[in-house]
Amino acid sequence: MGRKFEYRYSFTDAALMEIKWSSKALSDLARLYAFLAPVNMLAAARTVQSLVAAPNSLLMNSRIGEQLDEFKPRDVRRILVGQYEMRYEIQDAVIYVLRLWHTREAR
């Protein structure tokens, strides 16, 4: 007899998460744009757009980023977006984008 395969896809709680940007992260975006725009305005706009879109990938897998032990017990993590580091914190159903910067910046 043939086997019957059934595939079910169900959304987890992660699908119900939302993204919020801290004021410092928004300032970081403005700072990065201001730094890049005088050289190439189009590249600056594309960079900011990719950084703004990046956290959307976290909605389905919020724990994909590397956890930063120095912030425990908070759940602070980091991901790399091209040559930029983005730090975020998971609190209940909210992903807070905390800070972002170019990896070559002195931090």
Which residue ranges define each predicted feature?
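Basic, Lys/Arg-enriched alpha-helical interface segments
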Residues: 4-76, 94
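Enriched for short, Lys/Arg-rich terminal
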Residues: 2-12, 81-107
